[in-house]
Every structure is written in structure tokens, then in C-alpha cells.
Amino acid sequence: RQELKQRVLDELEKGERKFLIDFSQTGYIDSSGLGVLVSLSKKIREQGGELRLANLNDDLKTLFELTKLDTLFQISDTRERALETF
């Protein structure tokens, strides 16, 4: 979590404004992980950027729906679909 957060913040500092996190290798995320995503999304939006998510499994999709975080993030089924509209 901290590694991801620091990496994104470093890229934001360098001027990057478009971020995509691919969850294809992620089966589970806990509440602190969700908190990191929300925090990153806020910081990125404050700088005029956007954070998108891709390749969430069914359990993660359900988690994002139950926590209403699906309204905060643009979630795509594939990396390609997420990148098409960036």
C-alpha cells in the first residue's frame, strides 16, 4: 500500500495526471487499501488528474459497489478499455 501510494505521489509530482491501477493480480483489498485509493484519488483530482481502475474480479467489483466507491472511480473490465477513453 505505502509503496503504491509513494509511487503514485512521485509521478504526480513529476507532472503525470493520468493513472491506471490494474487489479488483474489482486484478489483482495482491505479497508486500509481502500483508504489509500480514496486518498490517492483525492490528491490526483486536486491536481487536475484522474485515477482509473481496471480488471477487478467479481468480489472486488462487489466490494466497490457495496462501499459506493464505484461512483468515485471509473472502473473498466480491461486495461485497454480504460486507456481508450483517457
Q: What is each residue range found by the language model?
A:
Residues 1-73:
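Amphipathic alpha-helical interaction surfaces in cytosolic regulatory modules
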Residues 74-78:
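Short acidic-hydrophobic, aromatic-tinged amphipathic segments that line or gate anion-handling sites
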